[in-house]
Amino acid sequence: MFKKLFHSALWGLAAAGVILFAVPKLNNSSLFSADDIVSFNSAVRIASPAVVNVYNRSFSSASINDSDQLQVNNLGSGVIMTKDGYILTNKHVIQNADQIVVALQNGNIYEANLIGSDNLTDLAVLKIKANNLSTIPQNKERQVRVGDIALAIGNPYNLGQSVSQGIISAVGRSAVGDSLGRQNFIQTDASINRGNSGGALINSAGELVGISTLSIGKTANEIAEGLNFAIPISIANDVLYKIIRDGRVIRGYFGVQSEIAANSNGGIVITGVTANSPAAKAGIQVGDVILRLNKQDNLSIREMMQIISDTKPNTEVIVTISRLGKVIDLPVIIEEFPSN
């Protein structure tokens, strides 16, 4: 038995010697060149100049005899969205600020003006007086997929710009934490800490995919790791342009709660109608099934909500419903969503 083991060991050593002789570089550290190292450095270099530090400063008085002084009340991050100085951040970062200061990665510091904010998405738009600023590329054709690499860039705990890496854990998340509104969060395990809010979530190509917003374990006082969320850039862009144009986000309002019908005919079942809402005024009832909205059928709940949200207040839409076997067209006057 020992003889067999001895022969096996000899054969193993001989085979190893042949391999090392044939491929001498295997025993040389130069086998791994800089080009062989997996790195996201190029993605970070593309995006990082457009990620800024945001400081919320408020007046405070240490004592009755001291004059009021501006002190940092909150901090976060922001993303430069246009070359002429429009910046997206989270509303909770700049809420109740007496002064908003933005620090760029090149060392330049600006006082920012608040253009407007949106409660439902927790987004705010700032403006600084600067030109030819760096922005992050976007790719509308590239879908965010579960399993994609995700890089979060921000200013956690005011340490300075930092990058954390993870993957896209899920998309289309709703009912997250204490957040309100029409949610469609990107979930990631890339770390988002205090100070990261309002920063960039990018992919491995350096393209902007979301605005970092919250972490469940840090907002709900729960022991949780890797449950971090970002607002998809498509929603963030929509909010940005509406705030730049109107100073706020104006949304259409319908006033129903709903779920997808379980029967083979499809449709959206109304499970609740808000009193005095446009739906209630139009005569829509619990149990009605929405078949079409302005002649568009086979809609998901999310698609229906988006159509209504994009409809200007005081616009009439035709809602086709099924009630007790009858198909009825009901005109509904869309009102403005009471965001507060």
Residue spans of the language-model regions?
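Short hydrophobic alpha-helical segments used for membrane anchoring or interfacial signaling
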Residues: 80-81, 321-325
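Serine-dependent protease modules
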Residues: 6-12, 21-266, 274-275, 301-305, ...
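Conserved PDZ fold ligand-binding element
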Residues: 87-88, 279-301
